[in-house]
Amino acid sequence: MPNIDLPTLEAFVHAIPQNYKGPGGAVAVVRNGEIVLRHAWGFADLAARKAMTPETRMPICSVSKQFTCAVLLDCIGEPEMLDSALAAYLDQFEDGRPAVRDLCNNQSGLRDYWALTVLCGAAPEGIFLPDQAQNLLRRLKTTHFAPGTHYSYCNGNFRILADLIEQHTGRSLADLLAERIFAPAAMKTAELIPDTALFNECTGYEGDTVRGFLPAINRIHWLGDAGICASLDDMIAWEQFIDRTRHDENGLYRRLSSPQTFADGAPAPYGFGLKFEETGGKRLTGHGGALRGWRCQRWHCADERISTIVMFNFEGNASDAALKMMNAALGIPPAKPVRAQANPGWFGSWLNPETGLVLSLEDAGGGRMKARFGTGPEIMDISGENEAQSSMTTLRRDGDMIHLARKDENLHLAMHRLKGEARQDIAGRYRSDELEADLLLVSEGGAIYGAFEGFLGKSDMYPLYAAGPDVWLLPVQRSMDAPSPGEWKLVFHRDAAGRITGVTVGCWLARGVEYKRL
């Protein structure tokens, strides 16, 4: 490819504080192992007036997952080496148990354990300890799809990997990372700090320019799924290590970034802690990271030997910034979608009975819709009277049915329009035997509220909103991890006499949790 258009790239970077508003951040572009651009702005701590620099360490959150998998490959070998240990770990399982490779590729079908902490009564700013993580993960008995058939993001996959690695090697993951990854890659200040409450070198902020920016409180202990703290310079060193070892047939990043498939042979979007994407016909590998108050993203284009890194100490869209930086570096112009006028027949709520997942659509203006299906809203471009798509989802409408496809997830669902009013007779206590947790629903002044209770405590009351007959939505926008589960979908079941017998509770991260009415 021709040389990078540095003025265009620099103009984009210098506009980041205006376009991604927040306390501070740091970004870099690396090409052919050399630094093209390295920039920090703003403050690491607003109250202390401590400036952000390329040496400032920040939590890289889920970007840590690739490093956990790197330790697995480097110290132990192929994932199958730990399959018997995983069988012992998930010894309560009733369904087909996933393999360790399924964990590495987010194809396990296990429900995300941070989402499950909500159902077990955790407070968003509560303390979450290592023994509580194992308590939750080892009680699991089922998956929300057959392992190897679909993709679903699951932090617990990598928490389990960390436990298995430490058990197999007899060493801490922190020591293994320092010796086998950080030292060879010259990541001089990178460190695993599992307790988020202990990190105080930089402050992460919740909020925005409307509500203001407030220091985020995090008191969770995570391992394997996240936990590494690193500076921009550390992350640059990782990209340079990737470039130095690119010709090594057994090079660590070549192994991490190798293509993966689903059980049916379809290409998978994820492997060994890395997300696979494409832009302008070029394959990208990388990962994002999020915790309350923090966002980061890295992308690597092996074909052109280009990497982009974005680190924010606020909840801005680091993924968007990193991809736009990559496109600028590659000389890819912004896409210009063709949009059609929205047909009102799109708008409303749609249910897939098999998964209990609900799709909500509303007009976003300009030939676009706001869709709520996963952990956060998606903006869909309407390309025809009965077709719409985003970067993740394609919708095709046929009367009162929408065919939803998420190619990367190997997921195809028939969504049925919800029509009619919801009955108000859902108050009561419900029990999940698998989680040993309760859902309490109450009616106050004609409004329905719900709370979760389990081994992690008793949650606040959350309002419920009707989506259709026997289908309700319970939004949870703050939880121990980020992003939060979003909307929990509650689908109620009745017997022949019309009495409620139970409810299926789920979200994209954790589907199909069955509760019986007590």
UniProtKB/Swiss-Prot annotation:
Residues 477-487 are annotated as: Important for specificity. SUPFAM superfamilies: beta-lactamase/transpeptidase-like, D-aminopeptidase, middle and C-terminal domains. Inhibited by beta-lactam compounds such as 6-aminopenicillic acid, 7-aminocephalosporanic acid, benzylpenicillin and ampicillin. Inhibited by p-chloromercuribenzoate. PANTHER family: BETA-LACTAMASE-RELATED DOMAIN-CONTAINING PROTEIN, D-ALANYL-D-ALANINE-CARBOXYPEPTIDASE/ENDOPEPTIDASE AMPH. Transmembrane segments: none annotated. It catalyses: Release of an N-terminal D-amino acid from a peptide, Xaa-|-Yaa-, in which Xaa is preferably D-Ala, D-Ser or D-Thr. D-amino acid amides and methyl esters also are hydrolyzed, as is glycine amide. NCBIfam families: PRK13128.1. HAMAP family: D_aminopeptidase. This is D-aminopeptidase. One of its GO terms (molecular function) is aminopeptidase activity. Hydrolyzes N-terminal residues in D-amino acid-containing peptides. GO terms for biological process: proteolysis. Homodimer. Keywords: Aminopeptidase, Hydrolase, Protease. The active site is at S62, K65. Substrate binds at D481. Belongs to the peptidase S12 family. InterPro entries: Bact_CellWall_Synth/Modif (IPR050491), Beta-lactam-related (IPR001466), Beta-lactam/transpept-like (IPR012338), D_amino_pept/lipop_sf (IPR027279), DAP (IPR023645), DAP_B_dom (IPR012856). The keyword Glycoprotein does not apply. Its EC number is 3.4.11.19. It is an enzyme of class 3 (hydrolase). It holds the Pfam family DAP_B.
